[in-house]
A protein has these predicted regions:
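Glycan-recognition surfaces
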Residues: 425-464, 508-616
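C-terminal beta-sandwich/jelly-roll accessory domains of carbohydrate-active enzymes
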Residues: 688-803
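Short Pro-Gly-centered flexible turn/kink motifs
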Residues: 95-96, 102-109, 289-308, 791-799
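Polysaccharide-binding surfaces and accessory modules of carbohydrate-active proteins
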Residues: 7-14, 18, 28-269, 285, ...
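Extended acidic/polar, glycine-enriched regions
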Residues: 171, 177-180, 260, 265, ...
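Aromatic-lined carbohydrate-binding/catalytic grooves of carbohydrate-active enzymes
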Residues: 331-468, 481
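Carbohydrate-binding surface patches
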Residues: 238-239, 248, 656-705
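Conserved, mostly hydrophobic/aromatic
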Residues: 15, 170, 294, 340, ...
Length: 803
């Protein structure tokens, strides 16, 4: 709901309120953002009096905005947006260079308008944005005018009441006769009157994405930013501001994200008066946009959520928003198939015979979608050639894509492929024909990544080529799934079609070109399931999710690492968009050995697939995989569409307000609850065994406290060899470890795992927790003992009882 009167603006969602007003000077003063509050009627200055700072004199050596209002200095105000040069020395919202070389801009209130629904976004160069299927979202547009020019600045607010989310964007319009340079135009600015916050960002690198870092803010500036040309595994655009005492389930928590896939910038700054400013938007470093007369520039949409129920509460807001108002198309509500990907089974060494053998094994195990990864086109036997040449290698696939696809379909599975459309190898027909299409600087050495260069997607003819090539490819066979990869960061930003003064536009124009390609292809092929990827999570953001309903979270498939990575993503993204695979051991990225069951359980809480050679699995492991897939299919609707909650996790802080580092905790807890709260799946994982600590508990979240649930675990059988020569404590004769006798016993004798099976009310499960059966402690074992070695995990199931 939006209340407006007397130049005061109050925006309400179901549980939050956001308020600002026009100052006597014309600037917009930010009044409040947080827990929902009542505002008196009529809406006037008296109604919001408790929220207004009372300024009667100029503080210290600060500068007054103008002599007529000498009590107002912009340096010490909470503002809705800030420009450069009029006394506010904090992070600006907008920064411009005028024709005369000056920097000072002076945006003041001109008008406002309210609308129902969202405007259509059909332009080819339009940025992606949130949407509402019922088109009932409320929209506020506030227009500011620049006292120094004929520029207008539109601030847009969209209210998603059901999600407790407000989105924001900005549009700069040049109604004058002279061009202006945009050095920065942020998407979001929120000023807080205090500085008692913790700033949380998610950092990492290839194969170790989304490591959570908490920094208590004090005087100064804290920046989370990407410089890679993508939203980046180094610094995801999702960030949080929370109270010093906030936990997973209690306390104030603000979440911020950006619907953008390029270089981004989030900054928290505390000024000398103890006020905190947050800004987010396109990274201003090396950004400079020439805005001619009569044109406009739009900033990406920013997403804001607040909850008084801690990190989990805020996450629920973000999860609902992404599921309902970002992800779209045919796959928005569809259950996703269980896939088998060929990459870690064969890498580049693929051929039709090998792929069909793998597919047949997959079909027997219950796989629904077979994906042929890299290596099928050109003369692509390694990563040094053929990107850009999307022609089938008929030596590897003599019957072409259509022939292989038909054989996969005849087995009863769908067929998918891997592509990397944005890239080109120097060793390719495309590069030889169009070297000018590659993004590099003429006459200067180019810094390559993974032996490849980027195509200049700021050029329309390059976009047309990609759209045409991919359209031909996707039409050539019954392709049901496409993995769209991007395996390097951007270097040497340069477009050969832009003049020198416009090279600061290249990074953003690249992203706009990418969006055009994705928009065209997803509209032409609406039934294809597209999965985004960028060397794992190097482009995991709301911009990509506006076109592709899921993203490969990380190239690291190690279960321990993935548990932390997926936990990191869960703060801002629902698990229904996180692609996760079960791989072989030793793991190909870490060489770590983890139990097959743990690998499955971690992957099951995302969009579950497999990435290992089923043909090489021992019968025992193959049978286990078959059982895993059957179980996942039974529960995947809950796992893919349910509400996800975190409990204890590997990144738990040692003390409140400390810097959160990687893997400091020992237990990971997750719960996923169906929308009707009738079913739930729990997960408990241990990093390392600690001796003589046999007792553990599991505490679910999100259940109906008044309902009675049947609680039980996934009970397993264990190979006797996991106990080593402890077998001699029960064997009538001595058995040498790994001997023929030991192996023979292991073939026929399995150790029963513990069973948890009882009924309890939801409140008892959530508030008291479940005290689990005793773990093995070195003094004996029976079917009531929990076998819980290093990296072990358990799945728990909760089903509401109707009697």
């Amino acid at each position: 709901m939006i209340q407006t009167a007397n130049d005061i603006f109050v925006l309400h969602t179901a549980h939050t309120t956001y308020a600002f007003r026009k100052l006597p000077t014309g600037q917009l003063e930010h009044l409040y953002y947080g827990r929902k509050i009542h505002v008196c009627e009529p809406l006037d200055e008296n109604a919001v009096a408790p929220l207004i700072e009372k300024h009667t004199f100029q503080p210290g050596n600060s500068c007054v905005y103008d002599r007529e209002h000498d009590a107002y200095t912009l340096e010490d105000l909470c503002l809705e947006m800030s420009s450069y040069g009029k006394g506010d020395i904090r992070e600006p919202f907008v920064e411009l260079i005028y024709e005369d070389g000056s920097f000072s801009s002076d945006f003041v209130y001109e008008s406002s308008a309210r609308f129902e629904g969202r405007e259509a976004r059909d332009a080819e160069d339009a940025l992606p944005a949130s949407y509402d299927e019922k088109n009932q979202v409320e929209h506020l547009c506030v227009t500011l005018k620049d006292n120094n020019s004929a520029l207008k600045l539109e601030l847009h607010y969209y209210i998603y009441e059901d999600c407790d989310v407000i989105t924001r964007s900005a549009k700069l319009i040049n109604d004058g006769e002279n061009a202006v340079q945009i050095r920065r135009l942020m998407s979001c600015q929120v000023d807080f009157p205090t500085s008692d916050h913790v700033f949380t960002s998610f950092h990492g690198a290839w194969a170790r994405e989304m490591r959570r870092w908490d920094v208590p803010v004090a005087a100064g500036k804290y920046v989370n930013a990407s410089y890679t040309g993508t939203s980046s595994s180094r610094a995801n655009p999702f960030v949080m501001l929370s109270g010093r005492e906030t936990t997973e389930d209690t306390g104030d928590c603000y979440g911020f994200n950006l619907v953008y896939s390029g270089n981004h910038y989030e900054a928290v700054e505390v000024n000398s008066y103890g006020k905190t400013r947050f800004v987010s938007g396109i990274n201003p470093q090396n950004f400079c946009w020439q805005l001619p007369a009569g044109e406009s520039f739009e900033a990406p949409e920013a997403v804001m959520a607040y909850s008084k129920a801690g990190y989990n509460g805020m996450s629920q807001c973000m999860h609902r928003f992404v599921r309902e108002h970002i992800v779209r198309g045919a796959w928005k509500k569809k259950v996703r198939p269980v896939l088998l990907n060929s990459w870690e089974a064969a890498y580049f060494d693929i051929n039709e015979k090998k792929l069909l053998q793998l597919a047949k094994a997959g079909k027997e195990a219950g796989i629904e979608l077979f994906v042929m990864d890299d290596g099928w086109f050109g003369h692509r036997d390694n990563d040094r050639s053929s990107l850009g040449d999307w022609k089938v290698n008929t030596k590897k696939l003599p019957n072409g894509l259509a022939g292989l696809c038909k054989k996969i379909n005849d087995l009863g599975m769908d067929f998918g492929i891997w592509v990397e459309p944005e890239m080109v190898n120097v060793d390719s027909e495309l590069y030889q024909a169009h070297p000018d299409w590659a993004m590099d600087i003429p006459g200067k050495n180019h810094s390559e990544g993974r032996n490849q260069r980027l195509l200049d997607l700021s050029r329309a003819e390059v976009q047309d080529y990609i759209i045409g090539q991919m359209s031909d490819l996707f039409s050539s066979a019954n392709i049901a799934y496409v993995k769209w990869d991007m395996n390097r960061i951007v270097t040497d930003y340069y477009s050969k079609i832009l003049p020198p003064e416009r090279q600061g536009e290249v990074a953003h124009r690249y992203v706009l070109g990418l969006y055009r390609c994705m928009k065209e292809l997803t509209e032409r092929f609406p039934e294809i399931l597209f999965e985004g990827c960028a060397a794992g999570g190097n482009r995991f953001d709301l911009g990509i999710l506006s076109y592709f309903p899921q993203i490969w979270a990380s190239d690291d498939t190690d279960a321990l690492c993935r548990a932390e990575i997926q936990t990191g993503y869960s703060y801002g993204y629902p698990m229904s968009v996180v692609s996760a695979h079960v791989s072989s051991c030793p793991n190909h990225q870490t060489l770590r050995m983890t139990p097959l069951e743990t690998r499955f359980q971690v992957a099951a809480f995302g969009i579950c697939g497999y990435e290992c050679n089923f043909c090489d699995l021992k019968k025992e492991d193959f049978d286990a995989v078959k059982a895993q897939i059957a179980l996942y299919k039974e529960w995947r609707k809950v796992l893919q569409t349910g509400s996800f909650y975190r409990g204890r996790n590997f990144s738990d802080q040692g003390s409140t307000g400390s810097l959160s580092g990687p893997l400091t905790g020992n237990i990971q807890e997750w719960t996923c609850v169906s929308e009707d709260r009738e079913k739930a799946v729990g997960f408990l994982m241990q990093k390392l065994v600690s001796p003589n600590t046999q007792f553990e508990y599991y505490r679910p979240n999100g259940l109906n406290p008044e309902a009675r649930y049947h609680f039980y675990n996934r009970s397993l059988k264990y190979n006797v060899k996991e106990f080593g020569d402890l077998v001699n404590t029960v064997a009538p004769v001595h058995i040498r470890q790994d001997s023929v006798a030991h192996n023979l016993i292991a073939k026929f004798v399995k150790m029963d795992g513990e069973a948890e099976d009882f009924c309890a009310y939801g409140d008892a499960l959530m508030y008291a927790g479940v005290k689990l059966k005793q773990a093995f402690g070195g003094t004996g074992y029976n079917e009531q003992i929990r076998h819980f070695p290093d990296f072990a995990s358990r799945m728990y199931f909760m089903e509401q009882m109707n009697d």
